[in-house]
Structure formats: structure tokens, C-alpha cells
């Protein structure tokens, strides 16, 4: 399996619109530098087994932070961040 984690951490980039999208999807009001720090920490703290490449995107699922990141595998550009649905345990 390829080492997506180190490549993404070294080359991650952002578009101007993605900051607003992340704040909206995660229901936060973070500044650009806070978002970049949060994304870096999520990627760094996620086990490589939770990196899944499907088509042109890499999905990074961090259950501890309850977040899934979507990153373009060709450009290493973050596309979005989504909250995971919490399942009710019986």
C-alpha cells in the first residue's frame, strides 16, 4: 500500500472556498490557520489503515475526532470534511 499519509502531510493545499465549506460542514467558526492546524492534526493522528483511496480521492476516517476528510489524490488538495454519523450502541 502506498504511503498516502506522509505525502499528504508534506503537500496538502487548500482553496479559498474550502475554509468556508469546512466551517459549514463541521459547524465551526475557525480561522484559516486554525483549520489548517486541525486538518494536519487529524491526518497526523489517523492510522494509515483508515486511509482509503477510491477513484481520484483519498478518504481519511478519524473515529476519535468523528471526522472524515476527502482529499484529491492527484493534487493533495483538501476537498471537504464531514462529521461521521454516530451510531447508537445497544
Describe the residue ranges of each PLM region.
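Ribonuclease/tRNase effector modules and their secretory precursors
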Residues: 1-90
